[in-house]
Amino acid sequence: MTTETNAQEAEQSAVPSAPRKSFGGRWTYGVIIMAFLFVLMPFLFWNATWFGRPLTDTQLGLALANRSHPREIQHALAQIEARMEAHDPGVRHWYPAVLALANDPVDEIRVTDAWVMGQDNTSQDFHHALVGLLTDSNVMVERNAALSLVRFGDDAGHAQIVAMLRPYTMASPLAGTLETRLKPSDVVNPGTLLAHVESPGGRKEVRATVPGTLERWLAQNGTAISAGQPLLSLQPSESMVWEALRALYLVGRAEDLPDVDRYARGGDGFSPQVAQQALAASRAIRSRATS
């Protein structure tokens, strides 16, 4: 750079830039309000769906009686579970309501209820209710009941637990023409839309009943299917496998070893912790078989 060039640059930098127009007070307040709403709305949604938000006894009673909002009942059940884990002596006041929900017509409520009843293995009323839920119309209710029964030292749900380690065949709930929506390797959760079935009565949805990964369709897209016909195969989710292996550590039998050892070898896209749990379950089963 020459001295002349430096002088020119200094002169240019000394020239004040043209003043920018202000947004004005209204625009400023508008931006602040919008920013606040962007923060507030996700919080309100989270606060309304997060089951960890504590409830007073009054709120708990109102939530359990809120038949128009099943998630409020689920929230109440989650709070009852938290009180059980904290060994709150007053939680037994809510046990009759928990027992009554075992017969609730809403599947999601029974799924949660079956899990919550397993948190107090001293309640024989819970024990009896869980045995009844092993034949529930919803497979997730059956599975949660089977896992909860293990806490009572009861392996009556052994078959349901072992099934959690295997692919799940989902049957069509109705007859009609199949319109598949997902492809193999897609991950699903209970409630995920899998397909539509076109019938004279209209276009109906088919949703997943268990979590997992779509292995393959057992019926072809565009073909006629009947109610009860095998529709697809789902590989089990990691959470299902993990819970089943934890249960089989306690109640597994020698005939379960082929299913357990498959996970002990690792793979299937699962975390190393699953293989470690499978190995622990395998050792526990072998120890019981030889003792």
PLM features per residue range, with description:
Residues W50-L64, E85-N103, N121-T135, D154-P167, ...:
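Amphipathic alpha-helical scaffolding segments comprising HEAT/armadillo-like alpha-solenoid repeats
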Residues A76, D113, A145-A146, A244, ...:
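Conserved hydrophobic register position within alpha-solenoid helical repeats
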Residues E179-N189, W217-Q229:
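Acidic, glycine-anchored pre-beta loop/turn
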Residues M1-R20:
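N-terminal intrinsically disordered, acidic low-complexity segments at the extreme N-terminus
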Residues S68-H69, P105-V106, S137-N138, T169, ...:
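Short inter-helical turns and helix N-cap capping residues of alpha-solenoid HEAT/ARM repeat scaffolds
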Residues I73, R110, E142-R143, V241, ...:
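Residue-level detector of extended alpha-helical repeat arrays and alpha-solenoid scaffolds
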